Amino acid sequence: MDPQLPEPEPLVSLIEALRRLPGVGVRSARRMAYHLMQHDLQGADMLGRALAGAVQNLRHCARCNSFTEDDICATCANPKRDPSVLCVVETPADQNMIEASHGYRGLYYVLMGRVAPLEGIGPRELDFQRLLERASDGVVREVILATNFTAEGETTAHFLGEVLAGKGLKVTRLARGVPAGSELEYVDAGTIAWALMERKSA
């Protein structure tokens, strides 16, 4: 319910900005905004500066498409990683969960999304051509499709599997230990490690 009293425009703008966060409705956004303005002005200032710094200084890695301050991220530049295996994930959060499993030492490619026809998101919007060029560099031998086990994630994996296999690459999919309909961000590290070990041909 909207408040009976009119709110100052800067406060309304802050509430609307906070509502853009996933899972945050108008009530939660209003509660956050009032908390920051009433109890934590220092935190509000830190949040504003951190957001501005991230927007200004972060870019996409030229190789894996994840976030970095440099042209090439630290993971892609690490000589101890296995460049012959490429793991494709939807988001940087999914990449972090796979890394936390300690079961993978290859490289990554982050799609920054998934195929969702009803939302107008297809291969062109996700720049699949860039992934195909990355996977066809002559070094990659296996591509692990680690998209989420949702309808959109499965559609994405199916499409990529067909195209990548047509390039002569070995294409595998995480094992079904990851529950159907789940997102990797919320799956425990042990389950992800098992799913990586038991991965199957896509």
Swiss-Prot record:
The keyword Zinc-finger applies. The keyword Zinc-finger applies. It comes from the Bacteria. Residues 84-179 form the Toprim domain. A zinc finger (C4-type) spans 61-76. PROSITE patterns: TOPRIM. InterPro entries: DNA_Rcmb_RecR, Rcmb_RecR, Rcmb_RecR_Znf, TOPRIM_dom, TOPRIM_RecR. Pfam families: RecR_C, RecR_HhH, RecR_ZnF, Toprim_4. Keywords: DNA damage, DNA recombination, DNA repair, Metal-binding, Zinc, Zinc-finger. GO terms for biological process: DNA recombination; DNA repair. CDD domains: TOPRIM_recR (cd01025). GO terms for molecular function: DNA binding; zinc ion binding. Belongs to the RecR family. May play a role in DNA repair. It seems to be involved in an RecBC-independent recombinational process of DNA repair. It may act with RecF and RecO. This is Recombination protein RecR. It comes from Bordetella petrii (strain ATCC BAA-461 / DSM 12804 / CCUG 43448). The lineage of its organism: Bacteria, Pseudomonadati, Pseudomonadota, Betaproteobacteria, Burkholderiales.
